[in-house]
């Protein structure tokens, strides 16, 4: 438990930030799932448009520090490899 007034404020702030980060991580997972569902349905154009949008969101969150830049690169690379395997 926080002892000082500033520690209590810091605790509140960290809780708010954790909630915000969880929301953003959930958003990223949703965009990734949209690409994967488009790949599963074998819809190349939908997969590519969803990939472009997902790529933009992942890069933005990697710049903000939500995820590591190497994880962002790995995710984009693996997802695009799945799209390429469709024969795109």
Swiss-Prot record:
User: What UniProt keywords apply to this chain's record, in alphabetical order?
Assistant: Ribonucleoprotein, Ribosomal protein, RNA-binding, rRNA-binding
Q: Which Gene Ontology molecular-function terms are recorded?
A: small ribosomal subunit rRNA binding; structural constituent of ribosome
Q: Which domain of life is it from?
A: Bacteria
* Family matches, as Gene3D superfamilies: Ribosomal protein S20
Identify its protein family. Answer: Belongs to the bacterial ribosomal protein bS20 family.
Region (Disordered), start-end ranges: 1-20
Q: What name goes with this protein?
A: Small ribosomal subunit protein bS20
Which Pfam families does this UniProt record tie to the protein? Ribosomal_S20p (PF01649)
Q: Which purpose does this protein serve, as stated in its record?
A: Binds directly to 16S ribosomal RNA.
Q: Which residues cross the membrane?
A: none
Which biological process terms from the Gene Ontology are attached to this UniProt entry?
Answer: translation
Q: Key word Flavoprotein present in the record? A: no
Q: Keyword Transport on this protein? A: no
Gene Ontology CC entries for this record: cytosol; small ribosomal subunit
């Amino acid at each position: 438990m926080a002892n000082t007034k500033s520690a209590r404020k810091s605790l509140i702030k960290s809780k708010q930030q954790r909630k915000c980060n969880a929301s953003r991580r959930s958003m990223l997972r949703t965009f990734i799932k949209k690409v994967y569902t488009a790949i599963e349905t074998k819809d190349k154009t939908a997969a590519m448009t969803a990939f472009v949008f997902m790529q933009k969101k992942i890069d933005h969150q990697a710049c903000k520090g939500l995820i590591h830049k190497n994880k962002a690169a790995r995710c984009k690379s693996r997802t695009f490899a799945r799209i390429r395997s469709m024969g795109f």
